[in-house]
Amino acid sequence: MIFGKCGRSPKGSTIDLYFIGDYGLTAMQPVNTAGAPPTVESLYYYLDIQERSEVRLPWFISVWGAGSQLEGEHYELLRRAIDLGGHIKTGLEMHFDPQDKPGNLDLIWQVRDIARDVGRPIASQAEARKLYGLA
């Protein structure tokens, strides 16, 4: 955020708010890891830091090492992030749970469905490029 505060963020810069689930980045069993847990309270903490920095860049969340995104706190975190104007980074590179093995498209559809549920439209490719200052 310091680059943004100094006006030196390149086009397309974003703020990625990382959350760490039960499986960390690649663990084969649940482990305690460093990082913010995937909760709405952690989201508010991150957003407070961003607000105090006075940096206004598009932001998104990514939940690393979590299982299904449509369960409990993970669902509420994604729903609240979308509702507050954030974006979601999803895909198999962040998903890890040895018992739950969705496809990449399944994870994308989960986020799409949450966005529709809160009334948030899905950006077209052109709209996304404009949003990130790449158009």
Language-model segments: what does each one mean?
Residues A81, V111, A128:
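Conserved, mostly hydrophobic/aromatic
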Residues F96:
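Metallocofactor- and cofactor-centric catalytic cores in central/energy metabolism, strongly enriched
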Residues M1-G91:
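Catalytic alpha/beta core domains of metabolic enzymes, predominantly
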Residues P121-L134:
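Long, positively charged, glycine-interspersed low-complexity recognition regions
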Residues I2, D100-N104, A135:
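Short secondary-structure transition/capping segments
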